[in-house]
Amino acid sequence: MSDSRQQLIALGAVFESAALVDKLARTGQISEAPLGCMLGSLLARNPASTLDVYGGDTLNLRDGFKALASALERKPGSLQREPLRYALAMLTLERQLDKRGDMLDLIGQRLDQVEQQVQHFGLVHENVIASFASIYQDTLSTFRQRIQVHGDMRHLQVSSNAARIRALLLAGIRSARLWRQLGGSRWQMVFSRRRLLNELYLLLRG
């Protein structure tokens, strides 16, 4: 798999998290499969490829690819504004996290603990999701710049929804970190927009 394809998969995963956060905030509901895919990416160890981090199937990131395509196409009518805002905010927070080795160590330690929990409860159990959410709350949400999630307050005030949103933001920032480690940069979204779109269309068709 080419470097650009691997970068695109990781960036698509950032947008997948963003799209799931948006849907959850607006409707109060998301499917278990995409939630499980993104939570599983937080615990992926020594994957054979970038795609293996996300279950080995591009279909798992389809909504993310669509949201990313809407951002790159620059068509006001089809732009998914909130997912784009969340995705860009996650990329920004990842840059801040990169300067905090202590926080990265803490997140790693806490994820090790969650992995043990998963063996007992399963990946999408509410206790596991609450643990992912508390990692986000204790670390990334302490930064001055926070991600403001917009949606229906009836859904946002439900504690289980709030926990899922925080867990998804943690997963999105993990994917942002992977994207940058693979050589991704925001400049590519500006100067290589057409190339990215062409490759994205291939992923969506595949």
Curated annotation (Swiss-Prot):
<dbReference type="InterPro" id="IPR035932">
    <property type="entry name" value="HflD-like_sf"/>
</dbReference>
<comment type="similarity">
    <text>Belongs to the HflD family.</text>
</comment>
<dbReference type="InterPro" id="IPR007451">
    <property type="entry name" value="HflD"/>
</dbReference>
<dbReference type="Pfam" id="PF04356">
    <property type="entry name" value="DUF489"/>
</dbReference>
<keyword id="KW-0963">Cytoplasm</keyword>
<keyword id="KW-1003">Cell membrane</keyword>
<dbReference type="GO" id="GO:0005886">
    <property type="term" value="C:plasma membrane"/>
</dbReference>
<protein>
    <recommendedName>
        <fullName>High frequency lysogenization protein HflD homolog</fullName>
    </recommendedName>
</protein>
<keyword id="KW-0472">Membrane</keyword>
<keyword id="KW-0997">Cell inner membrane</keyword>
<dbReference type="GO" id="GO:0005737">
    <property type="term" value="C:cytoplasm"/>
</dbReference>
